[in-house]
């Protein structure tokens, strides 16, 4: 397991008074920000890097340079055991190496999250799911839903850190439909633990400004611009969480932002049956 830095500036009051939620819904790759990456030390603790307005295409462009800078900075912090704030296809999240037990503990402390609540695992490719999970559905099903605003819960493999959600044999997998997160997960090369960027019991975040109270306790904040409409409650629903651990069935753990499309694919295309008690 990797060695983690202590959470920057963690205070006892923060550890005592925070809580969590896993949040909003929005469109896929559309993180928008107006300026190229630059450090902005508005608060002590976190370095802020702003992504280009759109995913860079030209290899030699300033946008590509800024995109690469942000990726390298995030990977370096994650490999050092730090906690990084990142944009996804649904909301802003907190990411750390799932292989670093100290970093996992740091995430729980700074959010004030109960350690009885699981963290999701973010991966960069469908092929990676087979390394970290016991997959009992067709690969085509995974490819229909990933990347996208869903969390698929399956039985975990022995490859995952035993300190990650030690109270359950299951793990939720995310492959966000967000260009930066896909690049980050692939460049990092291992499982990332992912949860929403907010204090426990508070609303999930659609912009970096909405979780500024966490900045002093983070090493890096990646600003991808606003995600969705902050005035719309639907934009804070978070990913749709589906239990696929029982062969031939599915269970909706959280309806989230993609319920209708997800259940349609599972039932109509793959013939899965909703499990008893599922809210589908």
From Swiss-Prot:
Cite the entry's keywords alphabetically: Cell membrane, Cytoplasm, Membrane, Mitochondrion, Phosphoprotein, Transferase, Transit peptide
Classify the source by domain of life. Answer: Eukaryota
Where would I find the YrdC-like domain in this sequence?
68-258
Tell me where the signal peptide lies: none
Where, per the database record, does this protein carry Phosphoserine? 61
Its annotated function is as follows: Cytoplasmic and mitochondrial threonylcarbamoyl-AMP synthase required for the formation of a threonylcarbamoyl group on adenosine at position 37 (t(6)A37) in tRNAs that read codons beginning with adenine. Catalyzes the conversion of L-threonine, HCO(3)(-)/CO(2) and ATP to give threonylcarbamoyl-AMP (TC-AMP) as the acyladenylate intermediate, with the release of diphosphate. Participates in t(6)A37 formation in cytoplasmic and mitochondrial tRNAs. May regulate the activity of some transporters.
Name of protein: Threonylcarbamoyl-AMP synthase
The opening ranks of the lineage are: Eukaryota, Metazoa, Chordata, Craniata, Vertebrata
